[in-house]
Amino acid sequence: MVLEMLNPMHYKVTSMVSEVVPFASIAVLLLTGFLLLVWNYKNTSSIPGPGYFLGIGPLISYLRFLWMGIGSACNYYNKTYGEFIRVWIGGEETLIISKSSSVFHVMKHSHYTSRFGSKPGLQFIGMHEKGIIFNNNPVLWKAVRTYFMKALSGPGLVRMVTVCADSITKHLDKLEEVRNDLGYVDVLTLMRRIMLDTSNNLFLGIPLDEKAIVCKIQGYFDAWQALLLKPDIFFKIPWLYRKYEKSVKDLKEDMEILIEKKRRRIFTAEKLEDCMDFATELILAEKRGELTKENVNQCILEMLIAAPDTMSVTVFFMLFLIAKHPQVEEELMKEIQTVVGERDIRNDDMQKLEVVENFIYESMRYQPVVDLVMRKALEDDVIDGYPVKKGTNIILNIGRMHRLEFFPKPNEFTLENFAKNVPYRYFQPFGFGPRACAGKYIAMVMMKVTLVILLRRFQVQTPQDRCVEKMQKKNDLSLHPDETSGLLEMIFIPRNSDKCFTK
């Protein structure tokens, strides 16, 4: 009787087991397959870097970039894993390279002319398939690059000396506008206004409010830097991006007003030759249907923000280095007096200012502003023996590269590092190849003119022996001083007087 009662239970248990086993088997098989996939994924890559570990590795590396900033994260990973390593940004494989042979390979080949970044982020700031800086559409990028190259060479390069010299002189004559109560000069603001004024006179030619535009350029740059790598979900939560939206809108609205004034001037001019410049060329291309209005506006915006964004900080660092190294200042002044003397600086002086040029190069090597380059592989390739798949993101850590190879004293600031010719594969402050900086030649002229005119009039000092080495900095898309920390002002002492330039 008992056996008969238990018999149905036996059949029920057997039935349950027979149903559960297939599901358990499937789960075990899926788990095994997933683990095999993870195991194989980790071992298919011969490139050093953090492990994948069930997707946790990519998440951690992405969060590190968002938290530390691009430049700081790159330096961390290169120091930890080597000079050619693999991480992930937004789930995409990304190579960080600070080895000169690999950097040279990437820069010289045309299948690395695209950059990478968050599509919604680039759309947000107006750079997605527009302008030149982060335009990742190779066809559209080539189309606008022609206009930039024309404006930044030839007649534009020749005019730069006079235009820049006039702007510097004008701003130094009203230095009180950028001095505080102690008489210390806000050098960053001074340089940003000079660079904006020079760029405007060369490329747009419409009067503007320097003070207001400089502030808005900084807001735009902060938004660009903050949004470049943000995940898509960030742009679905308005309160997260609202402050950046305002910064972008403020600058773009001002630029649109200025460009509309330029359009009216062009179309009402009796002689078109009287207003031919970069902006005019673009507006005429728009009229011919070759470029959209949005693309034209973005190109002009980028041309005007480029120098105030990077070159102003570069010169700022140079002046701090001069203040700390009086023997370098002495060498510079000796050459300036020999080549230029008391007359106005001319175009033919540029090639003769060799010490000034070496100083500029050493400053950009020792304390760079743009110390990384972002690219994307447009086809499969092999770099120094490592396979690189199409679509792989690449960051060239040139700031670190400049301290690793060739230079006799890589960790010191000294003109000895450029006493001999440096092969360009070891020193790339402007890049080279098909996507090299379009403004590298005009930038050198601009920096030489700025240094010559400023140093002829003033000796520069820093309060309390401040220096670039101890300065707080932020290393993200570019390397800037932390302006919230203060202590960035300098003392300008007129060379024709022993009296300190204070109130």
UniProtKB/Swiss-Prot annotation:
PANTHER family: AROMATASE, CYTOCHROME P450 FAMILY 4. This is Aromatase 1. GO terms for molecular function: aromatase activity; heme binding; iron ion binding. The lineage of its organism: Eukaryota, Metazoa, Chordata, Craniata, Vertebrata. One of its GO terms (cellular component) is membrane. Catalyzes the formation of aromatic C18 estrogens from C19 androgens. It is a peripheral membrane protein. The keyword DNA damage does not apply. Keywords: Heme, Iron, Lipid metabolism, Membrane, Metal-binding, Monooxygenase, Oxidoreductase. Its cofactor is heme.
